[in-house]
Amino acid sequence: MKETKILTAGDSSLLIQFGQEISPEINAQITAFVHLMREQHLEGVTDVIPAFTSLLINYDPRVIDYRKLKRRLEKLLKLEVSKKASSSRIFEIPVCYGGEYGPDLENIAKHANLTTQEVITIHSSSDYLIYMLGFLPGFSYLGGL
């Protein structure tokens, strides 16, 4: 994988930086690498947390040390990994427009020189890529908005 860097992130985490720009291609690289890591069952790895352009890997330093984990990750990064997500799913998210849940709908429509129905149609007629999960349970960061 091109442009990857492995950085230290505290005393029990490594951060793999896959690039600098948020893109579906980098997201696909991260997703594929997460799948590869799960298949490898790396001893000592306690969690993998994908983000927009990076992957945080938490590990137990009593089980695997920094240097050994870094070497293993470098080897995995050299493998040609299929960038096709193996388990893509579509989630339908209910949306409320206008009223107390969307008091700015009319201002958005006016600013865009559209009707409120056109804003709703444009917003609800697309599929959006989930780049990562956020700080609240179920809070997704979407691309393509």
What are these regions (language model features)?
Residues M1-L145:
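Conserved "landmark" site that anchors the functional core of diverse proteins
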